[in-house]
Amino acid sequence: SMGGHGAFYLAFRHQDVWGAAGSMSGGLDIRPFPNNWDIAKRLGSYAENKEAWENNTVIKLLYLLDGKSLNLIFDCGTADFFYDCNKRMHQALLERNIPHDYTERPGAHTWEYWTNSIKYHLMFFDDFFRKN
């Protein structure tokens, strides 16, 4: 959810601190949701503060990535309301030749989906920490 956005946001901006980041069903583009999660309280309304929204949505921060210093994993269920923005993030990373682990599978924004998804994230991070 928004924790996935936060994890990627912090990792993208602080690659000297983070070597890997993961997101399950993440809101990787906040712009389609201008009235949700009190984001407007922090960034101002989208209509009046588009630049702030552009500067703080993860999908627009890919220019910070060199494709070498950060290991990424993310996934989303095909019935999740964040599915489209995850698919767009995957495409944008592919276009920039940035390595990442992306999975989409049946499921929605539910604990049932995340209970399955977490297993793959744990394997990813286990591999990352064993190598580093």
Predicted regions and their residues:
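Non-catalytic cap/lid and distal C-terminal segments of serine-dependent acyl enzymes
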Residues: 1-132
